[in-house]
Amino acid sequence: MNLYELFLNQKLLYGTDPHFNGVFLTLLEKFGLHFKDLTALWKHAKTITDFDEQGIVNALKAYFVDQLPLPYITGSVKLGSLTFKTQPGVFIPRADSLALLKVVKAQNLKTAVDLCCGSGTLAIALKKRFPHLNVYGSDLNPQALQLAAQNARLNMVEVQWIEADFLAALAQVNTPIDLIITNPPYLNESQLDQTLNHEPRNSLVADGNGILFYQKLYNFLLGNRQVKQVILECSPTQKKEFLALFSIFKTSEIYTSHKQFIGLSIDNTKLPVLKIAQTKQIKALLDKGMTAIIPTDTQIGLMSYCQQDLDHIKQRDPNKHYVQFLAPSQINQLPKQLQKLAKLFWPGAYTFIVDGQSYRLPNSPQLLKLLKTVGLIYCTSANQAKQKPFGKLSAYQNDPYWVQQNCFIVQNSFKSNNEPSLIYNLDTKQIVRGSSTQLQRFQALLAKHKLRH
């Protein structure tokens, strides 16, 4: 039987499949027979009799009957100018994944990590495109890492490989990480189809409706400001949920050449941003130990449950105390001598010290609504020691010191007047701080309510 006769014979079996011609030509390459198209095949096929007939038959059966992915049969896949070896047990590289590389801002990056690297597609392509980068690839599957190392040699690039589970790999990188790029498992069970049956399930499916890995990465980013950029692949069917998860970060969507959504680029050089109405989300970040930068009725302030965190951010004397903000419903928790004054002076720009602790109920309806959710919390002006707070939130996003802090920004339509509150010490009966205008107002309120200073 010559090659032409084999083609006709197999076309009778599988010719109803619209991909038969292309698959046949591709599989011939595995056996050293290369034809540009069917015309070239027909021109020479009748004269070719020395070939592995049974091998070609078995390969066609593996594809059309057993539905084994073509790259597993051929043993390799070509993506642009790069060639990747493939084998069962390791996720097959996809050309669309390379669309993630077009958003890499490599000019300011030195070290990049490809998490869940599989056969090394993104790590190798990244190193090939940006040779100056120090690139790591990590995966939990030792078989995948062995194949990735082969692919790196095949494509003549140097990548360092780490066997570790997702974020655990980052602890094994000894230099500051600037870029994380990842195509982790993101499908749920309902999204699997028969064409994926032969690929490793743990490379495809994630718990938590497919976003488990992204939730872990979200939590990691909240406390790791040194990572400048994160690039993620995800399913188009998860776009809405995916964008919602990372909505507090500055992001841009990534699309393939076919204009299909494939992932997201996160600019982690900017602080996360929430609106003041997102009270539950704000409390969740505060509970994680983050500090809010938020406009108050006086100045742009810092809010945190931890005084030590405020000391660290402000770089100030740890022996000083901070004002505690509270909601109206919490006034009855105050010392008795302050409860009466609270009803007369609050909400307003008056801070009272009693028993060595400072309290204030701010004059901002939006802020009071937030305080009802977050509870009693420490607040201070958003500045370093011996410096003044900025007048605009945007200034914090553009300041190299502040964007490195474990902070997030809360947008509030209420504008601060850039004047600190008056402070009155009930323990010593003394005014600790206040402008001349504030003193006049304070004295007027004392007189109105027939109170003695």
UniProtKB/Swiss-Prot annotation:
A GO MF label: S-adenosylmethionine-dependent methyltransferase activity
Any one GO BP annotation for this protein: methylation
SUPFAM superfamilies found in the cross-reference section: S-adenosyl-L-methionine-dependent methyltransferases, YrdC/RibB
InterPro entries: DHBP_synth_RibB-like_a/b_dom, DNA_methylase_N6_adenine_CS, N5-glutamine_MTase, SAM-dependent_MTases_sf, Small_mtfrase_dom, Sua5-like_dom
Domain YrdC-like span(s) in chain numbering: 276-437
Disulfide linkage: none
PANTHER family named among the record's database cross-references: HEMK METHYLTRANSFERASE, MTRF1L RELEASE FACTOR GLUTAMINE METHYLTRANSFERASE
Protein name according to UniProt: Uncharacterized protein MG259 homolog
Species of origin: Mycoplasma pneumoniae (strain ATCC 29342 / M129 / Subtype 1) (Mycoplasmoides pneumoniae)
